[in-house]
Amino acid sequence: MRCLQNSAKTLPLAFKSALLPLSQRWFCKFSPKPSSLTNIFKVSISTMANTLNGNVIMTSKPQSTYQVVVAATKEMGIGKDGKLPWNLPTDLKFFKDLTLSTSDSAKKNAVVMGRKTWESIPKKYRPLSGRLNVVLSRSSGFDIANTENVVTCSSIDSALDLLAAPPFSLSIEKVFVIGGGDILREALNKPSCEAIHITEIDTSIDCDTFIPTVDTSAYQPWCSSFPICENGLRFSFTTHVRVKSSSAGEASDESDGSKVLQVDWKKFSSVLPKMIFDRHEEYLYLNLVKEIISNGNLKDDRTGTGTLSKFGCQMKFNLRRNFPLLTTKRVFWRGVVEELLWFISGSTNAKVLQEKGIRIWDGNASRAYLDGIGLTEREEGDLGPVYGFQWRHFGAKYTDMHADYTGQGFDQLLDVINKIKNNPDDRRIIMSAWNPSDLKLMALPPCHMFAQFYVANGELSCQMYQRSADMGLGVPFNIASYSLLTCILAHVCDLVPGDFIHVIGDAHVYKNHVRPLQEQLENPPKPFPVLKINPEKKDIDSFVADDFELIGYDPHKKIDMKMAV
């Protein structure tokens, strides 16, 4: 920035500013609209008057923060010969919508760019309308004195200082750094960078300008769009948010096996543009719960508790960047993992889970419950031919939870893996827990009953049908469980996770869950965590709980809800 040195060293800072000529007071060359000069002078005169009256003491510099907006290839290439080496109209529209979006209609955003980036914008489009354009240049020959809504500065720091102080702090809502290469290399991953909005281009493209990768020890994905194909390129929009001030230090280990980065969750709603904040996928769940509570059908149910119900619902989660473990309340991650591994093992013995401190099946495995449904000869803890048995021994005759069923029935899970590996275009990659001939032997007929898998673009996706969904207690578990299953199968089959589509028949809220769910609805979401799977394990039957590491799970507190049995 072409900054002019302030030589009035002995006066209070605000008083010095009021005495200096206008162009020096903001330390940059800028060209305001004539209509804005009145407001600028009002700010300056007010500052001087309050300082003289002893009402203003400027002891510290305002905090200067910003967000980065960039499109990059997998190799983090962003340009070739000073131009974008791709033509993506959808990306340009996203950039425009993002940088124009404000929550206060009286304010605008600022876009910070290097001189070469400014010059690469066609003249008819510059300055970028509806935004304050801040151009960084140290060249004495660069002059935009007659251009409205443009400020020139010599560095990012000086530009941020300018924008964080009056008068700009009163009219600028958010600051976006948009390029070019040198500017982004300096700005990306700095502690003052609160969010990174990156258009991730899957295709390798010849570039000569590159930027660093996103520091995943300091940032977590907030949201990521499903892949878009345009002009032969596949890309997606991902926003990463800063969850700690630097990459130094270790995340804390939680008792459930997750790793937590210290997240200041309160800031996200104010930091992120609303169009980005609202894209958090947890809102798929929260909005469905809200809709059921507000407009659900009042129905009786098997347990006698009573429900509010809606029929025919769908949620679609993107597994490519993060893992959909709900954050508006704490979900029992260790329970999710151990139960899924229990399913995979084919076990029907609830005591196996009990011994690990997992008691989610206790209600349906108790002596009183089994007697109540007519299974009086069944040993306590024996759930009958439920999920795992159907996955691994479909069609086998069930005796009890102690029998060895090796080689009996049809192993649907191994069949799914074989088809994914050897016939990925098969439309019959299906696993069903619904076996009508065995329903009368089950402690509880399967709720999540049918899963189909789909392979495309090196990704594995899963669509699961759930006939009955307890939105308060069950669904958060179900989302995590089938997302984890999809991630495990992708890992075993050398693919990457794609989508998890959750289709629900009867989606219901129990009457005694309404109040705790309303409490949960008051909690804003936090970033979803990231899942890491032990790369050494490739056999579906070899996994243990320690093979799954959850990074950055920092949910709101646990919310108790009583299980309807």
Swiss-Prot record:
CDD domains: DHFR, TS_Pyrimidine_HMase. It catalyses: (6S)-5,6,7,8-tetrahydrofolate + NADP(+) = 7,8-dihydrofolate + NADPH + H(+); dUMP + (6R)-5,10-methylene-5,6,7,8-tetrahydrofolate = 7,8-dihydrofolate + dTMP. Keywords: Methyltransferase, Multifunctional enzyme, NADP, Nucleotide biosynthesis, One-carbon metabolism, Oxidoreductase, Transferase. SUPFAM superfamilies: Dihydrofolate reductase-like (SSF53597), Thymidylate synthase/dCMP hydroxymethylase (SSF55831). Gene3D superfamilies: Dihydrofolate Reductase, subunit A, Thymidylate synthase/dCMP hydroxymethylase domain. Residues 65-242 form the DHFR domain. DUMP binds at residues 302, 448, 466-470, 478, 508-510. One of its GO terms (biological process) is one-carbon metabolic process. GO terms for cellular component: mitochondrion. Residues 245-280 are annotated as: Hinge. InterPro entries: DHFR-like_dom_sf, DHFR-TS, DHFR_CS, DHFR_dom, Thymidate_synth/dCMP_Mease, Thymidate_synth/dCMP_Mease_dom, Thymidate_synth/dCMP_Mease_sf, Thymidylate_synthase. Substrate binds at residues 69, 91, 178, 199. Its EC number is 1.5.1.3, 2.1.1.45. The active site is at 447. In the N-terminal section; belongs to the dihydrofolate reductase family. In the C-terminal section; belongs to the thymidylate synthase family. This is Bifunctional dihydrofolate reductase-thymidylate synthase 2. The gene is THY-2.
